[in-house]
Amino acid sequence: MSLALKQKIITKCAELDIPLVGFAPARRWDEPLFEPWIPEEFRPQSIFPETRTVIVIGLPVSLPILETAPSIYYHELYRTVNTHLDVSGYRISLILNSLQLPSIWIPRDGYGSISILKERPLAFFSHRHAAFLAGLGNFGINNMLLTEKYGPRVRFASIFTAADIPPDPVIQNPLCTSCMLCVNSCPVKALDGRKYPKGLTDKKACAIRSEALSKRYISPCGLCIKVCPVGGDRKLYAREDMRMYTGDSMEYEKYHKAWKHVRSYGGR
């Protein structure tokens, strides 16, 4: 295993303004940590048999922009983050290939449209589980991957490589506080309040909601990740008082006015 290669990738991620990167050996997918586990056909070596290590990169979505969701503002942020992730993942795979280490990039999404997700709510690879196995965080009741720096407000992409790279440890202590803000804020009741994986998102309900917002040019929804109290980004933006989202305090009226203003333009 090459510590030098690992550091080279971490340095490259810093150059690409990617704040989160983690490494997981492909064998971790064959060692179930909970049930139900990842089916064999969704594991890295079933997709790219040469895989020895999965590199996961993560980019945050800015909390103050997310707070306007659903809106054209968050819609554009989501698109921008996704594009940056895909380009960066592809570039990292090219660097590894140039070192004679067979590697491929896995895009952040693996579906053509929301209508497809309504029929079959699965992608061919789960970046959330990859991020979990690469030590970037663990699951919350909202079924999202919670990270220490950004809570669930992160998008992920992955690189499969034939290189043996020293792994990062899986985070054992749960980050989710079981506050239920995500459950209570979901407009389609897609979360049942049980901890993952016993409690699973109603993906069809979520997809129907996303499709409706997409027709108005203001998808995705984002409410369950907006209200999550976990993440160092809350301290950065002085968003640690969760009452600001309930409307119970006049102290935060200026924020609600700002969000309403943004939501009033650019979509239907």
Q: For each of these PLM feature ranges, what is it?
A:
Residues 37, 74-75, 80-260:
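Catalytic cores of enzyme domains
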Residues 1-10, 15, 31, 41, ...:
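N-terminal and secondary-structure boundary signal
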Residues 1-78:
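Non-catalytic, usually N-terminal nucleic-acid engagement modules in DNA/RNA processing proteins
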